[in-house]
Design a protein with these regions (language model features):
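Extracellular beta-rich repeat passengers
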Residues: 1-3, 19-40, 44-46, 50-153, ...
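Catalytic domains of riboflavin
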Residues: 13
Length: 438
């Protein structure tokens, strides 16, 4: 337990092993790292030297099994607002550890290039530990280039708070990949979900507190550039929105799965695919899902039992054309091969949504979590396990606003997939012999 006023600093490249016990319970709790309110963790790894939390067991140990639930996880608690009377609540998986407050800018530290594998031990029926739990964590906290793989319960779960996530992945977790609840109002961009055949949903997003579908603050995640990959044999919805959650979802690619997006148990929020209508409803009382969302390779319904019974105008628009991703599973339903980078001539580069203009979101010219570059390379579980498709030749995609001096070498491969604007004061230099494809 990192107590109030204490900072735990973890050096890049550090590996922390979790003790294994086949009989974890409430009386024999699984080991986990808990940052209490007012404490901080400074875990700043790099792509070449990530910080890794994993089980002490190796894959050839007879107790390793499918690699899930072998120890606890990482639990961070902050003072940011949550939807609960009194402003605080006890965190899931522990006894008597509180989260929540009134400071949306609360700072619990830094998680950068942090990998959490093999966690999620069950300590009681329906009481498991998530890979990374962010409970009442504020936006002053940095969470980027983080990964949860082979967790028994959820990958990332946010209970209220305002913390933002960028460049994060959840791989082969037993429950939901990104789970939000209790008034979470953070932002996320460049998020990847890779579901094994027995994983649950890519997102499960709730808001209801004490039976009230309109409890405040209403959960209202703003997520953009998200890729959710699974096989068509997967029986669960890719995204599940329910219990009064609002939100803003743009530039998504859903590849595979049975059904796409399900929404039920609305509160009084407006459900719409029209940004003007969402703006008129006002934050956080709308649920906006972009009509440019790519849903390809589904076995069932793109909008599964989608509840649109509000004052909003719901059109059920989506894009069916392939983004050029590929994914196979092995005999156990676990990832075997994976190509997360979309085709330059596919649907990922057509009808791209503008992201919200603020200090967090990065303007992109593609949908999904990846353009031509793969930010998983060099540090992810998927890369280390040899599951990522190796590109023979990197393609640089050109489009949007060029805001800094740029040099295009003749040795590169370039694809102009939209208008490219060289802005005032910027110089674009193109080497002799360069070929740019349109």
């Amino acid at each position: 337990f990192v107590k109030d006023g204490v900072t735990l600093t973890i050096e890049a490249g550090t590996e922390i092993l979790g003790r294994y016990d086949a009989n974890y319970s409430a009386d024999n709790p699984a080991p986990c790292l808990v940052v209490e309110q007012g404490g901080k963790v400074m875990a700043q790894g790099t792509a070449d030297a990530p910080i890794t939390f994993r089980s002490e067991l190796s894959e050839d140990d007879p107790n390793y099994g499918n690699g899930r639930g072998l120890w606890g996880g990482l639990i961070i608690n902050g003072y940011a607002p949550i939807a609960n009377e009194g402003g605080t609540a006890a965190v899931e998986g522990l006894t008597g550890v509180l989260y929540g407050g009134s400071d949306p800018d609360d700072n619990s530290g830094v998680l950068r290039y942090v990998r959490v594998w093999n966690g999620g031990s069950s300590i009681a029926p329906d009481n498991e530990i998530n890979g990374i739990t962010l409970a009442g964590v504020g936006r002053g906290t940095t969470v980027e280039y983080c990964e949860v793989a082979l967790n028994l319960d959820d990958g990332f779960e946010m209970f209220g708070g305002t913390v933002d996530l960028k460049y994060c992945s959840a791989v082969s977790v037993g429950d939901d990949a990104f789970d939000t609840d209790a008034g979470y109002q953070g932002r996320g961009q460049f998020l990847l979900v890779v579901r094994a055949d027995d994983s649950d949903k890519g997102h499960e997003m709730d808001s209801k507190t004490n039976g009230d579908l309109d409890s405040q603050p209403r959960s209202h995640p703003h997520f953009a550039n998200v890729t959710v990959i699974s096989s068509v044999a997967h029986g669960e919805d890719a995204l599940r929105l329910r219990e009064g959650t609002g939100g803003d979802f743009r530039n998504y690619i859903i590849h595979g799965a049975n059904d796409g997006v399900r929404n039920d148990d609305n509160g009084s929020e407006v459900v719409t695919q029209d940004l003007a209508e969402a703006a008129a409803a006002g934050h956080p009382d709308f649920l906006y899902v972009s009509g440019s969302m790519v849903m390809n390779g589904l076995g069932g319904d793109p909008w599964d039992d989608f509840d649109e019974a509000t004052d909003g105008t719901w059109t059920g628009t989506y894009v069916m054309e392939s983004a050029g991703l590929s994914y196979t599973v092995d005999a156990n339903g676990l990832p075997a091969t994976l190509d997360v980078t979309p085709s330059a001539d596919g649907s990922a580069y057509e009808g791209v949504d503008d992201v919200i203009e603020d200090d967090f979101f990065v303007p992109t010219y593609y949908k999904g979590a990846f353009g031509s570059a793969n930010w998983l390379e060099g540090w992810s579980y998927l890369d280390e396990a040899g599951l990522l498709f190796e590109q023979e030749e990197a393609v640089t995609l050109l489009g949007g606003n060029l805001t800094e001096d740029t040099y295009l070498a003749a040795s590169g491969t370039y694809y102009l997939n939209q208008q490219l604007f060289v802005k005032d004061g910027v110089t674009l230099t193109i080497e002799a012999g360069t070929e740019i494809l349109g």
